[in-house]
Amino acid sequence: IVKLPFTTKQDLRDNYPYGLQAAPPSEIVRVHASSGTTGNPTIVGYTRKDLSVWSEVMARCLTAYGVTRDDTFSVAYGYGLFTGGLGAHYGVENLGATVIPTSTGNTEKHIRLIRDLKISGIACTPSYALYLAETLEKMGLTKEDIGLRIGAFGAEPWTENMRKEIEERLGLKGYNIYGLSEI
């Protein structure tokens, strides 16, 4: 395996913006980018086939977590250049469940939507899940009032202790959703 070539994030940065793109520009239908906080942003172009595979992989992950066509799922990642929001969004749709693209911000409204629309699952960062729990409590509501049962958390590191706290405070089962732009 040591003889197999591989591409590093630095390789992508050194060839910014499109130097290592594996498809011709005419086949690229969407572009995402990293934040660029530690160097040049990593620019990633996606073909229709890439997006189809991505959606299918996300649907499989969600299915493994117990999400079904009968679920309503809030995607509370940011939408835009960051890949998380759209990846989770299209995965939920591919599965046949209902997606609510709540994105980020206005947490009290988000909690009311979770309660009123009977949202059963959420995809967001673990830190936002903890903030949801804090806001829920400040609103005088309980985990029973909102009825979440599944959480797909990612886009930042989190610990097993954070998982336990999120599960306890929101009354759901939390799963780590893995992702990266570069593949």
Regions flagged by a language model, labelled:
Residues 47-61, 72-131:
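AMP-binding/adenylate-forming
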Residues 63-67, 115, 137:
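Residue-level signal for alpha-helix termini/capping positions
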Residues 1-33, 39-56, 60-64, 69-70:
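Nucleotide 5′-phosphate-binding alpha/beta core
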Residues 34-37, 73, 122, 151, ...:
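Conserved S/T- and glycine-rich ATP-binding loop of Class I adenylate-forming
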Residues 143-183:
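Gly/Ser/Thr-rich phosphate-binding loop
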Residues 63-67, 91, 143:
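Glycine-rich helix-loop-beta junction characteristic of Rossmann-like nucleotide cofactor-binding loops
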